[in-house]
Amino acid sequence: MSNSWWLKPAQAIDVPMREAALARQQQLTKPAGSLAQLERLAVQLAGLQGRERPAVDQLWIAIFAADHGVVAEGVSAYPQEVTGQMLHNFVNGGAAISVLARQLSAQLDVVDLGTVSPMDLPGVRHLRIGAGTANFAHGPAMSVEQGLAALQAGRDSVLRAKAVGTELFIGGEMGIGNTTAASAVACSLLECAAPLLVGPGTGLNAEGIQHKTRVIERALALHAEQAGDPLNSLFCLGGFEIAALAGAYLACAQEGIAVLVDGFICSVAALVAVRLNPSCRNWLLFGHRGAEPGHRHLLETLQAEPLLDLGLRLGEGSGAALAVPLVRLACELHNGMATFAEAAVADRPA
């Protein structure tokens, strides 16, 4: 494809700043390694931000919303109109991610990529690619042109974020049926059996999970030629919001903005991004381990070290947002603690 912008290498890690941050950690008034993952997080951020003392003051949360044609197969516990209703809820401040964004003083960018019913909501950026995806149980979820537009929508949000000095980017999603699409994409990329990854999504019972699994298995057979191919798997089985998330993660890595990845659906988008451009992996931090059974498998595949494990399954970017205070505290500890020399404390046990 011409203008395959996603293949541009990610920005390089600032190794000298990372090493300087590591050296500082070793001089702080605590036993070496005692703050464990928080130490590693601060050092990692120092390398990503190119400064010995990192900070996460400017936070951008982008929510990409779209509907899914596969809902016609009866794979969701909720009706499709909920996607549009939640767009209202996001901009009216009543959704979980809206509350979290306020508390974290984050910029909230809500993007409609294609709900079934067109809407004109103040506070929502309307970048309609279509009236939801097509039913991937019968054909490709989207055309190549639609898929490229969705990738670009994610990139556009990142460029907006960069323009205001964003230091950490969180992507979230809304779309009834999107755990089905995400599971299908993951199965195609990992070339694994659907029962290993498929879960309840928004609340299916055991019978519903079995039906959802069968729908995905039929779709995987239909699109078997795309197995292992990140772009084709995304376009044949994914959703506009999943493609936008993948585009956002790729753009963040290219623009030098650290990412805090949310749950199962966002991790599938991260897998797509890494398969398209492995150099973006260094820029991805992971907020939490969710309840969806496939999430653990994805995190292992991506060699991720999530910050939280609360059994969450909401989406919207909520799990990543909940991890932001830990990220900020990791920076505060790194930046604010005294060194042994400053505190006149012996730096070795007697």
Swiss-Prot record:
It comes from the Bacteria. InterPro entries: Nict_dMeBzImd_PRibTrfase, Nict_dMeBzImd_PRibTrfase_bact, Nict_dMeBzImd_PRibTrfase_N, Nict_dMeBzImd_PRibTrfase_sf. It is an enzyme of class 2 (transferase). Pathway: Nucleoside biosynthesis; alpha-ribazole biosynthesis; alpha-ribazole from 5,6-dimethylbenzimidazole: step 1/2. The active site is at 316 (proton acceptor). GO terms for biological process: cobalamin biosynthetic process. Keywords: Cobalamin biosynthesis, Glycosyltransferase, Transferase. The keyword Nuclease does not apply. Its EC number is 2.4.2.21. It catalyses: 5,6-dimethylbenzimidazole + nicotinate beta-D-ribonucleotide = alpha-ribazole 5'-phosphate + nicotinate + H(+). Catalyzes the synthesis of alpha-ribazole-5'-phosphate from nicotinate mononucleotide (NAMN) and 5,6-dimethylbenzimidazole (DMB). HAMAP family: CobT. Belongs to the CobT family. This is Nicotinate-nucleotide--dimethylbenzimidazole phosphoribosyltransferase. The gene is cobT.
